[in-house]
Amino acid sequence: ALTFLEEQPQVDPNRLGVYGHSMGGKLTVLTTGSDDRVKAAAPSCGGISDRYNTDPLFRTTIGDDVYLSRIRCPMFFLSPANDFHGRINDLQEAIREVQSPEVRMNCAPHHNHQDTPDYEVATQLWFDQHLKKNFEVPETPSTKLMLREKRRPRFILVPDRSREILSVDVYYTQQGEIVDGPGNMDNTKNRFWHHVKATPGKADWLADISFVNPNRPLWIYANVNYPLEKEVIGAGYYYGIYKADHFTISSPMTMLDSDRLKKLGLADTFKTSAIIEDFSEGWEKEWFHYRENEWARKTHKVYEPRWQAPDGAMLSFEVRTREENTLVVGIDHFAAEVKINGGEDWQKIVLNPGQFTDADGAVLKGWGKIKELRYGPSETVRSKERGSKKRKSFGGPWKGVKPQLRDLRWGVK
């Protein structure tokens, strides 16, 4: 492919770039690590985690680490924090293995194998800098985690201030697995990332970590968000067109195991909470979506021990919308429809597991081991039976403005 491009009259053979998503991300790394005609590359969701295969032939021919260590051109890794194919802990190895002095990354919290425009746009900006020479991507922020005896951890970040900074968001999880191979997919795809909004100082930004259990590992990183002078339009994942007015640069992730946290005498500030979401300012940072123009949201809060359901609990929340509607609430591959009366008054909704059904008509047996909570106007769930093509749709078109929600919690009868 590179040779073909070199021979085209409209192509500058000295400015060839490679990017790809998923298996295309792996192929980006393999191509870039084997051909120095590539002048810049941007692998997405791949090319960093094929390092666990013990077969000698695999390890020496198509293992990701073999090719990463041969790369010397500028690299930008697009690596969602919960991606199953390019795992965020392996990214930390990858950025050390690459031999290029020009390496950046972005890591969308909660996302698995998809991204939103503020992350997707990085590929275009990277090539604008290194192939077109008409843009400058900020440097990777430097970070330091202060662990203070009997006090809360403090994360300190020094971002590149060559551009205006919109905000700095710190994310941490205590559900990371240090040995995180392909056999641990549930954790990889569903671990919950707590959000802390960093506050600016004279040169750095600070974030104090509120809830920490020293008996569990701690993974923490930061996203620095920058505005774009003008909107950028491009082709994103799965052939979708995106429009971005800002972009994100991530820091490397600090990873500490529980033994180190305990040795340091870190204060145990972990507390369980029946309140899953209070919908106060910034709440959406701990929820996620993939479609910018829709209001449906998802979260992995219910997978985190802090918000796991107590025995005999009911899921409750209050909702208000002007029009009569049907709201869909989803739990993993189950869903339930909720009738909303409409009007100015808040309506309390109480749900038990038996109200949630799957594509095969089975009901949710309990809240134990649930991983994802969702709400939206409609959704289709798919059967988990091997070989089954059964699907079941819930909800439908929404009337009027999006709903308001408050006081999402576990309640006991």
Report the location of each language-model feature:
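Surface beta-strand/loop "capping" patches
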Residues: 128-172, 194-200
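Extracellular ligand-binding interfaces
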Residues: 275, 287-369, 374-391, 398-404, ...
